[in-house]
Amino acid sequence: MILVIDVGNTNCTVGVYEKQKLLKHWRMTTDRHRTSDELGMTVLNFFSYANLTPSDIQGIIISSVVPPIMHAMETMCVRYFNIRPLIVGPGIKTGLNLKVDNPREIGSDRIVNAVAASEEYGTPVIVVDFGTATTFCYIDESGVYQGGAIAPGIMISTEALYNRAAKLPRVDIAESSQIIGKSTVSSMQAGIFYGFVGQCEGIIAEMKKQSNASPVVVATGGLARMITEKSSAVDILDPFLTLKGLELLYRRNKPTTEK
């Protein structure tokens, strides 16, 4: 079995694979002050609930966009699983040709998603990840990662509206059936929801235009389902795209299952 860990700005997603099949998955809050022991106890609780043991795990791979948590995360892997994890970063074999100004500055989550989408759905492909930031990545028909766009995420934008506009309340993010709100709350929810639907459709349309191609569009991330159910611009919703990419990268870099 392989343990895959995606450390995002808001949540960490943990998954267990066996023979390329996702058996279990969990989420926990990303807390850069959490110790290796706290991380270990959390993961072991997940395992206990699923009737798994640390000895079941033969390899670990981690993707992280939160550098401060990585020392604790790596220590946790060694202390509780007796495994030194494979870290997604410079030097790892991805199979992607990165045609960008500085390949080292591309977030590991974007690389992982690009690898998974290219393998699973073919190229050309656009990957949209609705996370803390909303990211758009374009991989051309030759499998070359051409770059993309990064926009503020839905949660960030909603909190900014509340924090910077004195008379506007904090609202829950929700799908709105009406673009014309009848109250402050419903107006904010309509603006947030339809604003991001429009942003998604607009950026995808412009990427298709500038690339002069007809890529398949794959969406992932915590809020992807809500947006994609309203938008016809997205072809495929894959909530486990990042975990798939991590498992694939593990196989490409560690074909054996030795500890």
UniProtKB/Swiss-Prot annotation:
Its EC number is 2.7.1.33. Its cofactor is NH4(+); K(+). GO terms for cellular component: cytoplasm. It catalyses: (R)-pantothenate + ATP = (R)-4'-phosphopantothenate + ADP + H(+). GO terms for biological process: coenzyme A biosynthetic process. The keyword Transferase applies. It is found in: Cytoplasm. Substrate binds at residues 107-110, 184. One of its GO terms (molecular function) is metal ion binding. Pathway: Cofactor biosynthesis; coenzyme A biosynthesis; CoA from (R)-pantothenate: step 1/5. Its main location: cytoplasm. CDD domains: ASKHA_NBD_PanK-III (cd24015). A monovalent cation. Ammonium or potassium. PANTHER family: TYPE III PANTOTHENATE KINASE (PTHR34265:SF1). Catalyzes the phosphorylation of pantothenate (Pan), the first step in CoA biosynthesis. Homodimer. This is Type III pantothenate kinase. The lineage of its organism: Bacteria, Bacillati, Bacillota, Bacilli, Bacillales.
